[in-house]
Amino acid sequence: MLISKGNPMLMGCSRYKDGYNFTYESECENAALLIFDAHMKPKERIELDSSMKCGNIFSVHVSGRRLDTCFYCYEIDGLMYLDPYAKAITDCGRFGQTDEKDVYLAAIDVADYDWEDDRPLNYDYSDCIFYKMNVRGFTKSRTSKVKDKGTFSGIINKIPYLKELGITTIELQPAYEFDEIGRFPQLTDTIMSKYGAGTHYSVDKNTRKINYWGYVGGFYFAPKASYSSIASKHPGVFRDYTVEFKNVVKELHRNGIEVVMEMFFTDESTGFILQCVRHWVTEYHIDGVHVYCDESALKALSQDALLADTKIITVYWNGKTGTKKHMANYNNDFQNIARRLLKGDEN
């Protein structure tokens, strides 16, 4: 195995120059990259010091060995931390449940995907009819008549129903790896510590109430594992579940339906938010995002050339836009009034 200084511009883990580039932000002077084999057993430990640091970013390049099926995390002061840029995470397949045997690690690589000729649909807002859904709640009911209830695959089973409704766009409530049960203490308790996000050995019995809706911090670059039939059917065994989300997007697009994701950010930096949205647009072909973030991040999203065709929806946009109207305000007042009318509420 060959170890050298990496490219600090590539956050997270990525294939790079016949090897793998690992980059991690931390204010610590020293850290360690821990690599685990396909069975999640310790494989390599790589010390990170000031020679591999630029500003607050550690970066290391690893080559000479195939690591595609391996996992990783970082160790700082004896604690193990997940990468905030993790693309897929182990042992998160059971919604609202944890086990003392769970080990939370990030997958080094995810499978290549054949998108065929798929691309975002880019409907004008004036032509859109939105349908907002919670992935789990949409098909979890016994009456849903789908095979994989409460999962991304369940949405595919309901495409004929969605088309019958006449909708053009589905909006997914948080479907990234949000922390619904407090399995990542560092993340849940401090949002984002100066050392990183999340520790992998949370062994105390969890007494937190389940956050069903997902408006909480999380690992924003990874799909929600427990929303995947692949991960939920095989707890304790990692299988690349990212393909399931991609299947959903491709099949919805094939049937003329856009996909917009809700993303609830807390105190994440503008750069992090921009990279996150770019990731979902390029890696998962989503058509847009409904974001909760501060004004500086929103402005950066609105001006990003890569996102010029991507729907960016918020609750307080009053700025300028380009030749294509891709920015929009979310009108909750109309939604709430319409819901009360349909339900027959008195107020």
Can you describe what each PLM-predicted range is?
Residues I129-Y131, I170-L172, V259-M261, V289, ...:
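Hydrophobic faces of well-ordered beta-strands that scaffold small-molecule active sites
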Residues Y24, Y74, M133, L162, ...:
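Conserved, mostly hydrophobic/aromatic
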Residues E25-A31:
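Short proline/glycine-enriched turn/loop motifs at strand-loop junctions of beta-rich domains
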Residues C276-R278, T282-N347:
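Active-site-proximal helices and loops of the catalytic beta/alpha 8
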Residues S144-T151, G182-R254, F265-E283:
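Aromatic- and acidic-residue-enriched carbohydrate-binding clefts of CAZyme catalytic domains
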Residues A107-F178, R183, N211-G214, F219:
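An acidic-aromatic substrate-binding cleft motif
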Residues M1-G19, K43, M52-K132, T139-V146:
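The feature marks proteins involved in alpha-glucan
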Residues H39-E47:
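Surface-exposed loop/edge segments in extracytoplasmic proteins
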